[in-house]
Structure formats: C-alpha cells, structure tokens
Amino acid sequence: MIVKILSSNDTGETGGHQAGILVPKKSELLDFFPKLNSSTKNPRTVMTLSDEHGEGWSFNFIYYNNKFFGGTRNEYRLTGMTKYIRSNGLKAGDEIHFSKDNPGYRLKSKKNNVSEGPIKLTGSWITVKTKI
C-alpha cells in the first residue's frame, strides 16, 4: 500500500493548474504502478481502481519523458483524479490510500481535517493551522 498526503496544489485549492499528482521517482513507489515502456515518448496507461464503496475510477499513470525526445520534462504523474478528489471533498492534508488487490487496484480516502487553510511550506518547516 502507498499513501499520498494531498497538498493544496493537488486538490486545486491554490487555483493553479497542474498536470496531475507528481509521483516521485522512488523504486518503492514506481514498483506499485503498472510498468511503462520508457523507450516511447510519454508512455501512459489507464488504471482502473475501486473505492471502498465499490465505485470504479479511472486514472492515467503517465511518464512524461520528453526530455529524452527533445523536450524538458522527466517526471511521473497520476492524472484524471480531479473528479475523485472533489466528489470526496478532499482538502490539503487529507490522504488517498492506494493498494493492490487481485485482480486490480483499490483506493480509499481519509479526511484528516488538519487545516482550515493551505499548508504553508517554507524550506523544511511545515506550519499547520489546526482547528481548536
């Protein structure tokens, strides 16, 4: 199982646009996801996941590798998650738990209610505004 703690950028709270949730290039994370053919430009696959209510969700796992094809990007992303995040009312600090289940993938959300505003990151310090 892997867990993604959502940032305000992941949830759209910053108002910015990003091309999906960044998946760090760590083997323990990448081994969880389907294998992609890195010899092709921007390989991707559709992942079908079931949530704790039995509802199916489709996300795209993409390796933006155009750096090796004349571009600038070299990163993995999980895209197509906006509807899931919004329908579950997820905010910065909440979690999405991903697990493998025969024959596919499962996910579940966990609301942490840690913040009334965006989590502010400054260097290695994290300031969290908690509810009293």
Give residue spans per PLM region:
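Acidic, low-complexity intrinsically disordered regions
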Residues: 1-132
